């Protein structure tokens, strides 16, 4: 074997990315598929991040489950930034970002469109995340790969993304936060970069000891932020040119 600790699967893995879907059709947290994956995780001593459209309060949610090596459910996270400009307008957004402890490592989740907003990774970093995992299902990946590398750099967290293969898609990847060596010389922080068409299992190795040492000494993450200047980030008003037909200016 390859001695993997955790398997990251793409977005909506158990249900398929087929929308619209009703709350009745969405999976409950005690669905048999999740139980089977928990049993397999325990048998293989392998953590798993698996995804599905799940039952929400009124509408389905786009969710990820983090399963520990002993088959225990460590965390459920529901996508905050649903794609309200597309088919996901039928979904219910999650309300909070979450971090869990996986074998002594703090893990956070962003699902697909969450990664388009730097606030997602920033909040996970503030909550203690050391590694951010990104179940994904979309194309036009080139600028998004650059963004994921930047999220790793600016928050001093490892980032890994799993995306279904296909033309202009795929590109499952992983990035280290370590972007320069002890002498200040820039290093390539890319740990994994798959092509768009290859299908299979891809492996990335995060050196947690090196990452933790780096985080203790460098000046990014939550070191010298000037939070008093960030108040506009909390303003909900949407104005031109960002206001869309299905939005209210006070959303």
Where are these regions (language model features)?
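C-terminal beta-strand edge segments of enzyme domains
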Residues: 99, 164-251
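Active-site/binding-pocket entry motifs
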Residues: 14, 83, 209-210
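Active-site catalytic loop in hydrolytic enzyme cores
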Residues: 55-127, 136, 140-150, 154-157, ...
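A generic "binding-loop/recognition-motif" signal
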Residues: 13, 70, 116, 197, ...
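Structural motif
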Residues: 5-6, 107, 131
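Cys-nucleophile CN-hydrolase/nitrilase-fold catalytic domain and related Cys-dependent amidase chemistry
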Residues: 1-76, 122, 138-155
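CN hydrolase (nitrilase-like) catalytic-core segments centered on the catalytic cysteine
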Residues: 30-49, 116-203
């Amino acid at each position: 074997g390859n001695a993997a600790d955790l398997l990251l699967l793409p977005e909506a893995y158990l249900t398929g990315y087929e929308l619209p879907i009703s709350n009745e059709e969405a999976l409950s947290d005690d669905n048999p598929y999740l139980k089977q994956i928990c049993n397999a995780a325990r048998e293989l001593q392998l953590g798993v991040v698996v995804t599905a459209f799940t039952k929400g309060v009124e509408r389905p949610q786009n969710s990820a489950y983090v399963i520990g090596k002993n088959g225990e459910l460590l965390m459920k996270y529901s996508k905050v930034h649903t794609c309200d400009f597309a088919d996901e307008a039928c979904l219910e957004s999650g309300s909070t970002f979450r971090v869990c402890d996986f074998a002594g490592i703090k893990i956070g989740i962003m699902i697909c469109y969450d990664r388009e907003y730097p606030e997602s990774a920033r909040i996970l970093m503030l909550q203690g995340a050391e590694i951010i995992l990104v179940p994904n299902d979309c194309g036009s990946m080139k600028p998004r790969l650059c963004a994921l590398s930047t999220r790793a750099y600016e928050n001093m967290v490892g980032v890994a993304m799993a995306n279904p293969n296909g033309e202009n898609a795929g590109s499952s990847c992983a990035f280290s936060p370590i972007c320069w060596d002890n002498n200040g010389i820039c290093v390539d922080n890319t740990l994994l970069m798959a092509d768009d068409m290859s299908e299979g299992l891809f492996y990335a190795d995060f050196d947690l000891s090196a990452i933790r040492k780096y985080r203790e000494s460098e000046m990014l993450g939550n070191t010298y932020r000037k939070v008093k200047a960030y108040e506009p980030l909390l303003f909900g008003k949407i104005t031109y040119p960002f206001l869309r037909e299905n939005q209210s200016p006070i959303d």
